[in-house]
Amino acid sequence: MTTVLQEPSVARTPGTEELRIEADWKPIYRMGGVAALISVAVIVVAVPIYLISPPPTSVLDWFTLFHRNALLGLLDLDLLMLIGIAMSGLIYIALYGALRQINRPLMALGTIVGLVSVTVYFASNTAFNMLSLSSQYDAATTEAERSRLLAAGQATLAIWQGSAYDIGYVLGGVAMLIIAVVMLRSAVFSRPTAYIGLLTGALMLIPATAGTVGLVLSLVSLAPALIWDILIARTLFQLAAPRAEVATAEARAAS
């Protein structure tokens, strides 16, 4: 009779290759943490600017604003938001690295949706187009030129808060929802972080251009977004710390 020997069961421990791969992600985690803190700064600065200097309501008022203060004109046309959106792209990539072992397909989907939202939003922003049109309007010498530039400015403003903006905004909310769902199953990020991500993503499903409701929800969403960025930054910096790859790999093995 043949006796079958069975090896005693042991807890799974992270291998050398897994630790090496995790160490390779450290610069990305650090970059994502810095990006999250920059996003916090963007929100803190952008909200007072919006409240103190609301965007003009007509093309001529926009041109006047750019003539008086070009920087304020760019800020009212979401220049800071462009920076924040660019930082979001870096955060998506860092979060993919941190959560890829929990659900790789879902994190890939969330990251792709997030990066598409960044791309679409950049395509919709017309801040520098308006700056150029304003300069041309100031230099125009005939009424025909001014009328043409006013029409071009109107078309540019329509693009700024048109379909591309709405799609980019909503896709950003969808990406956050997907990533937050994966976070709920992770031992790396806290459950409060995941729940705040779910709340922020849900509030972003209605774009800011959707009347008063959209505007109010967009402003309300900034509060949980601010907290989420702070929590994300803290965790990403922890993952980037020396020897953190061991604890991270063990936490994933236990998930």
Predicted regions and their residues:
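Hydrophobic, aromatic-enriched alpha-helical segments typical of multi-pass transmembrane helices
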Residues: 2-255
